Amino acid sequence: MKRGGRDSDQDSAEEGTAEKPKRPRTTQERSQPCDWGNLLQDIVLHVFKYLPLLDRAHASQVCRNWNQVFHMPDLWRCFEFELNQPATSYLKATHPELIKQIIKRHSNHLQYVSFKVDSSKESAEAACDILSQLVNCSLKTLGLISTARPSFMDLPKSHFISALTVVFVNSKSLSSLKIDDTPVDDPSLKVLVANNSDTLKLLKMSSCPHVSPAGILCVADQCHGLRELALNYHLLSDELLLALSSEKHVRLEHLRIDVVSENPGQTHFHTIQKSSWDAFIKHSPKVNLVMYFFLYEEEFDPFFRYEIPATHLYFGRSVSKDVLGRVGMTCPRLVELVVCANGLRPLDEELIRIAERCKNLSAIGLGECEVSCSAFVEFVKMCGGRLSQLSIMEEVLIPDQKYSLEQIHWEVSKHLGRVWFPDMMPTW
């Protein structure tokens, strides 16, 4: 009896200590909404960083907490102002009220800023108006981009320079500056150098007619950390290449040169000494030297007369067989070649010479040119699988006794190690 009593007491104790089943949630509890406003601001901030500005603005209206996150400095480091006139552009512009709010509440937070303007003078003026108000910010990058014609050039030079100088003076750590197609001049570049010489790493200023060779030389002499530079050929000089090759200067990584002629016979193109190129490539052996040519045939005489360290060549107008032949002889570092037009004389010998001497060539594009199918196959065979980009219009290839258009893609594919077809001209 006692044993039985003890067993009974033990069973009762175990039942008492057993976990009670959870009470199911009532319908009222299940339907109670979550309070999203109580999310940690760090979490909301992380989500907001992935949202477009318009969606972020809508989300900021959910509650006071989210609105506070919307105005946090981290979300306003980078901004692109899009300035367009409805009458001349179909692109959506940044709302004027938003621009006012940014200048009022976030101008001191901005660090990475770009302006995209359409072809109207009014849009360029609006960009300058915003620039002139950025007196409390220190930008790291600035880009002025004309999406159509260069509308900044329509402004009075003094008005543009005044606005740009505000940024140069107040930004003490500017590292990237893109001001192509603008009326920037030598004195404004001196202001840039005086305030940002230790930090400037990238400068793109193609088609800036008010800058002289002395002006860009001042930048190269003082900005020893400059790694990327884009300019027009008339600003290139032996002195500039030697300044970029000095012991104080870091190794340049990218140099783009635009060689442009608007009026045939009226533009004089000077010659750069071979010794200057040699010093430049010795100092920066891995530099990408990109050259865009928009010249008429008779204007190529000063170019490709001796070896130059060009890696990327783009010919935007018709270029003669003779010039392309000289390219094969003088550009051993060539990586990419694009020829928009040549004429009706086949480029067989020129392509073979380029394949023989340009051992790093990995990309080629041919537009309105002519090449025999046999020469093209031989060219691909010599280059082999290193041709990662091969863009040739079908009209360029001329069938011969050895290959037809139907046969050539098999032969080229075999040497490339991948399936290849010539580009087709759209029929619409």
Swiss-Prot record:
One of its GO terms (molecular function) is ubiquitin-protein transferase activity. CDD domains: F-box_FBXL3, FBXL3_LRR. GO terms for biological process: entrainment of circadian clock by photoperiod; proteasome-mediated ubiquitin-dependent protein catabolic process; protein destabilization; protein ubiquitination; regulation of circadian rhythm; rhythmic process; SCF-dependent proteasomal ubiquitin-dependent protein catabolic process. Ubiquitously expressed but enriched in brain. Diffusely expressed in the suprachiasmatic nucleus, SCN. InterPro entries: F-box-like_dom_sf, F-box_dom, LRR_dom_sf. It comes from the Eukaryota. GO terms for cellular component: cytosol; nuclear body; nucleoplasm; nucleus; SCF ubiquitin ligase complex. Pathway: Protein modification; protein ubiquitination. Disruption phenotype: Mice show defects in behavioral rhythms with an extremely long-period activity phenotype. The onset of active phase is abnormally delayed from the light-to-dark transition: in constant darkness (DD), mice show significantly longer rhythmic activities. Mice lacking both Fbxl3 and Fbxl21 show an attenuated phenotype in behavioral rhythm compared to Fbxl3-deficient mice; however, they exhibit unstable behavioral rhythms, sometimes eliciting arrhythmicity. The keyword Nuclease does not apply. It holds the Pfam family F-box-like. This is F-box/LRR-repeat protein 3. It comes from Mus musculus (Mouse). The gene is Fbxl3.
